[in-house]
């Protein structure tokens, strides 16, 4: 279904696909008696394949615009997403829209449920930071003709609008800066390799290390689920029995602050003992210690451009996808210094 053709998949679509009557399909989907298991399974399979979603709202799908946009992100407690959500909501209100905000906790099943909830609320469009562990949620959006824009993450092989920052450049700048300070043993804490921003930041960091002739120890490239508990556990284990390192590149400010807290618990000072560089520059919008050296990208621009792009998609319907990649740069503050001699 073309983007912007906001038409829900109906029972008649399942009937056309399976050859069963609408009445039989309705009974199967409602798990009523009088339907063979084979027929029920065939109908359920077809319904899933074409993206059918039972509408939970009384009276069915409303016609016209609801003036509502769903914002779906991985972690609404993450300061980065809190900032972007706030900006998106403000921008939507300027255009007469209200927002519904949902979090996925990086779980694809929760992303799919959030999409189903958005469709059942008859939203006009979706701003989505995808988990990238599954395409099921995005497939539902496409099958139901729901306009959407990806924020902060992208799929290389997906025909969809997105607004991201130059993650590869940001990773390069972080690695280049630490290498120029003299660091050779750098711990890298990534998110999952399935996340485009994480993969691209690591690619840029690798490029910087290659240019400086610094070998990357695989034992110093770790994956975090971005939770405080996980980051603390990783630092605890490394300091007790892991390889030595003099600096840390964390793939988000959120992880960086948790890492600094863990280092301080072990009596290590930042940057006196260990240097730390983050990514996001949350402190461009919030003021709290420590002043973190980090990679900045324009969060306000990413948020406002995502809203503008989505509203344009809603108004104009099917067009070629728009891909926006915004610049990133290093912000030097107080958490990185040359390694101790």
Where does each model-flagged region fall?
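Flexible loop/turn connectors
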Residues: 232-341
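Hydrophobic alpha-helical segments within soluble ligand-binding/sensing domains
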Residues: 163-188, 203-207, 228-236, 256, ...
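Short, solvent-exposed amphipathic alpha-helices that sit
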Residues: 42, 79-94, 170-174, 196-215, ...
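An alpha-beta-alpha
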Residues: 172-214, 219, 322-336
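Short beta-strand segments enriched in small/hydrophobic residues
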Residues: 17, 22-27, 61-77, 177, ...
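N-terminal helix-turn-helix DNA-binding module of bacterial transcription factors
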Residues: 1-67, 340
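Amphipathic helical "hinge" segments at domain boundaries
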Residues: 37, 41, 50-125, 203-206, ...
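Flexible loop/hinge segments that line or gate small-molecule binding clefts
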Residues: 98, 106, 129-173, 194, ...
């Amino acid at each position: 279904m073309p983007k912007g053709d906001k038409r829900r998949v109906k029972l008649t679509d399942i009937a056309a696909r399976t050859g069963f009557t609408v009445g039989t399909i309705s009974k199967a989907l409602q798990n009523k008696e009088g339907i063979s298991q084979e027929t029920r399974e065939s109908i359920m399979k077809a319904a899933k394949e074409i993206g059918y979603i039972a509408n939970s709202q009384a009276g069915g799908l409303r016609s016209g615009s609801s003036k509502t946009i769903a914002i779906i992100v991985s972690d609404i407690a993450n300061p980065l997403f809190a900032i972007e959500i706030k900006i998106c909501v403000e921008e939507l209100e300027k255009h007469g829209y209200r927002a519904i905000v949902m979090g996925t906790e990086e779980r694809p099943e929760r992303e799919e449920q959030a999409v189903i909830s958005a469709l059942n609320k008859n939203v006009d469009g979706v701003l989505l930071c995808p988990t990238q562990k599954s395409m099921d949620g995005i497939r539902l959006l496409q099958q139901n003709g729901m306009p959407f824009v990806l924020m902060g993450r992208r799929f290389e092989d997906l025909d969809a609008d997105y607004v991201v920052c130059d993650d590869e450049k940001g990773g390069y700048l972080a690695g280049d800066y630490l290498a120029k300070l003299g660091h050779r043993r750098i711990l890298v804490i990534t998110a999952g390799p399935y996340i485009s921003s994480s993969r691209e930041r690591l690619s840029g960091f690798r490029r910087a290390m290659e240019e400086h002739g610094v070998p990357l120890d695989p034992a110093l490239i770790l994956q975090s689920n971005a939770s405080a508990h996980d980051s603390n556990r990783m630092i605890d284990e490394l300091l007790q029995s892991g390889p030595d390192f003099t600096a840390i590149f964390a793939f988000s400010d959120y992880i960086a602050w948790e890492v600094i807290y863990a280092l301080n618990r072990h009596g290590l000072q930042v940057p006196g003992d260990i240097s730390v560089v983050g990514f996001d520059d949350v402190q461009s919008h919030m003021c709290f210690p420590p002043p973190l050296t980090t990679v900045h990208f324009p969060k306000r621009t990413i948020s406002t451009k995502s809203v503008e792009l989505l509203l344009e998609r809603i108004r104009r319907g099917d067009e070629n996808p728009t891909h926006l990649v915004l610049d990133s740069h290093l912000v030097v503050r107080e958490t990185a210094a040359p390694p101790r001699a």
